[in-house]
Structure formats: C-alpha cells, structure tokens
C-alpha cells in the first residue's frame, strides 16, 4: 500500500481487494461450518409446528452465501478466487468433522490436512489476530473482524469452525432476542411516518416558551427516537439536519453549539426502555448469573430491573444536555417562542398516540402482562394502525392520492431498512457471543479476573479503571459486540468488589453511550460529520463541552448507586 508508484486511488483499490479476500474467506468458512451445524447438531425429529428445525436454520447458511455472492464482480475475480481458496483451506477441519460424524469415515489425507490447518492457525495466531484488528481500522466490517478472530482462536485451539456457528445459532434461540429486530422495526415505522414532525411541533410548543426551550425540545426528540429505533446513528442521519435547521433559525445558538448538542444527545435514548442495549446486556449477563447464583444480587438481575436501573441516569443525561442549552440561551439573551395554549393543545392531541408508546411498554413489560418480545409485537401492530391512520389523514389534508401501492412501497422500504439494521446487529451479536464463549471456555476470562484481582485491591480504583476501559471500548467497538465480549469479564469482578448487578449494568451502558462521542474515533462523531456536512475535527471541537458534561454525569452514576437502584425490585 505504500509503494511510491501507487496513487491514492490505487491504494484504496488494493485495500478493497484485500478486504474482499478476507471477507470471502471468512464467509466461506462460516458457510461450511453452518452446513455442519445443520447436518450434525440439529435433530430432524424435533420439528416445530410440523416443520423440520433445519428449515429455521437455513437463513444462517443463506446469509453467509449472500455475503460471498455480493463480492462477485468483474473487478473482484482475483481477490474472490483468493478468498475462496483460503476459505476452502480453513474449512478443512469442518470437512473432516463431517466425514467422521456424518459418514463414519476416517479419511487419512483429509485428517492430516485438517491437522495441518490447526497447526498453522496456532502458529500464526498472534499475527493473524493483529492483522484482523489492523484491517478493521482500515475498513474490514466489524462482524467479519470478530468472526475472524473467533475463527483463528477456535481453529488454532484445535476446534472446528462449527463451534462458532453453533454458538451463534443457540444464541439466536434466546427468548429475549426476537425483541431486538421487532423493536427496530417499530422504531423505523415511527421515524419514517409523520410522527417526526408531530413530535417536533409538540416539544416546540410545550417547551419553546422558556429560555432554551426549543433546544431542550430537540434533546427530547433525539432521546425519543434513539430509544425506539435502537440505533443512535439513525437519529443523527434522519433528524440531525431538521433539528439543526430549527435551532439555527432561532438565532440563539452558534452552529457549533447546535451540532455539538445534537450529536451528544443522539445516544442518550439507549438508557431508556425498550433499549436494545439493555436487552443485549441482559442476554450477555444471564449465562454468568445462572452459573453463579451466589453472586451479589443475582436474583435482581432481570431485564425489567436493568430497564428501571438506567431510567434515572437517562433522565439526568437529558436534563444535563437540555440544561446546558437553557444556560446558553439565557447567556445569549435569545428570543423566546410565544406560548399558545391552542397550538399546544392541538399538538398534544395529534401526538397522543406516540406519547402513549412508553405507557404501553411500561404497562405490558413491567407488570408482567407480556414478555418483551410480545410487547414489541404488540407495539408494531399498534404503530401500523395508528401511523397508518395518521398517514391517510395527512395525505387527505394535502390532497395526495392514497394509492395502495404507495403504502405498500412505504412498508417494504421501512421493513427493509429495519431488517438491514437488525440483521447487522444480530450477526454481530452472534459472532461476539462465539468469541465470548471462547474466552470463558478456555479459561481466559477466569485468568483475566484473577489477574485483575491480584493487582487491583480497591473498589475505588476498580471503578476508575472500569470507566476508562469502557470509554475506550465504546469508542472502538459498537455497543453490542462490546457488551457480549466485555460483560463476561466484568461481572465476576463486579461481584468481587461488591457492586450490585443493576448498578454495574447502568455504569456499563452509560459508559458505552458516552463512548460514541469519545475522540478520536467515536462513531457518532463521524456520523455527525456526514449529517451536518462538516469536517470531523470541527465536530470534535463542538462536542467537547457536552462530552465533558456527560463525564460529570458518569461520575454521579458511578459513585451514587442509589441513582440506579431506586426503582429496582
């Protein structure tokens, strides 16, 4: 990549071809392993509603096959072939496993080849892992990086790649996991409907009359939409320009202040139910607490309690961001939006269906009337009815033809966008769980815990180091993979230092929420740069004051457990 006769375009081309080769190699290996998972581990005599269980696992195979076929392009022939060859080489242990356990056949040549792959991966383990991490920084998709590291560790440790795909399949059978794509679909229905404009109008009418009210309203809108889409990036990209335009039109704020406020507010919604981050944390921690019932407060480790534990920190974050806007507005002597009770009442009436959403979630989830997955399903049904009626009403008022085909296209587009986000999240979760299981099964997690206990003897020092580690982790990794990899390591340490499970969860999720803003590579910084069409360094500078304010809130959440435990049952 550094040859002097290469221009910048050539460097990008070579890099993309290397990424293609790695992607195809890993995807083909996981495709082979997925076939083994279906053939060797799933019993055909366990049908679901009369349908063979293997049918439900087919998307796993088709997904990896789709990744490979997506790279089939004329300009990719050489890297594609290279990836296929490497993938076949890495699949040899899986082929050998299939021959032995399915066909009861020991093929000496295949067995020797599989053993050679194990030995080669073991010898090159460190170099391959460092190489994958380096390629991740240069553009290799995160789930491929995690899958590649898991592949190197498992195969280098004498196991077959089937362990990875089987772990992912087992995780996807978790009863809480379907809530993730369902809430994502619900969030996208909400964000793509007219609810956005109605909520913005409501919050402006309700809060715009006091100093900084419109900025405070913008914070609430960001929080609301991040909560229900489950992806803070969607909030920035879909609503950043709209909200920035509204605030800049007031003349009360500098452009950098507006961009910093909206960027900093875009991830706060991850602290409110039905936060997908909380669901993933619960999934990651359940295995640990089930196997260690003697851990401090293990009986309190429920998804409902974690939801309750992050509500107060979320409120404090929202007040901190909104309060800073109020202070800036007072300082600049900004004009206020005149309160009109008629307009406010009309806006309230129009947004009543959306305002009932939190109540629906609380009513069904926290009272036990429905499981999290059932609540998500009911929410989708509710939104389809409500937003469908409002869409029809809006079109009628604007005298727009309400063709059935247009509504169908809207639904297909919404579900397609939601599925791409949810699918990406689920595959990251599956690969991260496989890596996490390796750390546990091979004793690396236990070694890390013991090593930490030997050098950290103070709860104060542990919490300080934990916050630093999690801020860095949140900067480098997405919240889902970070949760599944890191949580099994910190829960035993939290128990050792006497930290309540719900308090630990609140600290963890709060840190990773702030991690999205942490320079130099916090994800939201780059998304904001794109959304606001500003250099990323400009976004850095605009975010710093709000980032520091959020660190103050983090200190409160860390050192005042009551903030997280006040509602815990």
Question: What does each model-identified segment do?
Answer:
Residues 36-40, 44, 77-569:
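Alpha-helical transmembrane segments of multi-pass membrane transport proteins
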């Amino acid at each position: 990549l550094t040859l002097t006769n290469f221009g910048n375009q050539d460097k990008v081309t070579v890099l993309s071809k290397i990424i293609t080769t790695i992607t195809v190699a890993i995807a083909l290996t996981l495709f082979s392993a997925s076939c083994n998972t279906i053939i060797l581990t799933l019993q055909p005599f366990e049908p679901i509603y009369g349908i063979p269980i293997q049918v439900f696992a087919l998307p796993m195979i088709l997904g990896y096959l789709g990744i490979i076929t997506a790279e089939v392009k004329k300009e990719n022939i050489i890297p594609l072939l290279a990836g296929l060859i490497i993938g076949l080489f890495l699949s040899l242990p899986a082929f050998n496993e299939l021959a032995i356990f399915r066909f009861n056949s020991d093929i000496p040549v295949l067995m020797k080849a599989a053993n050679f792959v194990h030995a080669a991966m073991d010898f090159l383990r460190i170099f391959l892992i460092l190489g994958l991490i380096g390629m991740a920084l240069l553009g290799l998709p995160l789930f491929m990086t995690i899958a590649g590291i898991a592949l190197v560790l498992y195969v280098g440790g004498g196991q077959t790649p089937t362990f990875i795909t089987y772990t992912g399949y087992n995780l996807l059978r978790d009863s809480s996991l379907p809530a993730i794509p369902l809430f994502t679909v619900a969030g996208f229905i909400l964000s793509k409907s007219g609810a956005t404009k109605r909520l913005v109008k409501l919050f402006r009418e309700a809060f715009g009359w006091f100093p900084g009210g419109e900025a405070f309203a913008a914070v609430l809108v960001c929080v609301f939409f991040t909560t229900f889409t489950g992806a803070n990036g969607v909030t920035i990209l879909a609503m950043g320009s709209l909200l920035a335009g509204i605030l800049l039109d007031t003349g009360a704020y500098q452009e950098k202040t507006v961009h910093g406020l909206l960027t900093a507010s875009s991830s706060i919604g991850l602290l409110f139910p039905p936060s997908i981050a909380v669901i993933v944390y619960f999934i990651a921690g359940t295995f640990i607490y089930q196997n260690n019932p003697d851990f401090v407060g293990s009986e309190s480790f429920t998804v409902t309690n974690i939801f309750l534990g992050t509500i107060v920190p979320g409120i404090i974050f929202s007040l901190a961001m909104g309060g800073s806007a109020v202070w800036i507005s007072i300082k600049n002597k900004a004009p206020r939006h005149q309160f009109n009770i008629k307009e406010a009442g009309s806006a309230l009436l129009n947004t009543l269906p959306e305002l009932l959403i939190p109540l629906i979630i609380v009513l069904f989830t926290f009272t036990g009337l429905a499981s999290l997955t059932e609540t998500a399903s009911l929410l989708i049904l509710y939104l389809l009815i409500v937003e469908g009626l409002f869409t029809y009403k809006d079109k009628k008022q604007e005298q727009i033809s309400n063709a059935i085909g247009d509504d169908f296209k809207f639904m297909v587009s919404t579900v397609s966008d939601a599925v791409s986000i949810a699918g990406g999240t689920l595959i990251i979760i599956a690969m991260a769980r496989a890596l996490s299981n390796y750390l546990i099964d091979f004793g690396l997690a236990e070694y890390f815990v013991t090593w930490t206990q030997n050098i950290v003897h103070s709860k104060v020092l542990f919490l300080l180091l934990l916050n630093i580690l999690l801020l860095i982790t949140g900067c480098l990794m997405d919240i889902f993979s970070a949760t599944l990899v890191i949580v099994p390591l910190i829960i035993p340490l939290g128990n050792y230092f006497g930290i309540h499970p719900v308090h630990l969860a609140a600290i963890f999720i709060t840190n990773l929420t702030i991690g999205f803003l942490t320079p130099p590579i916090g994800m939201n910084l780059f998304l904001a740069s794109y959304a606001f069409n500003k250099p990323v360094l400009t976004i850095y500078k605009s975010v710093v004051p709000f980032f520091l304010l959020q660190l103050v809130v983090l200190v409160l959440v860390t050192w005042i457990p009551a903030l997280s435990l006040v509602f815990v049952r």
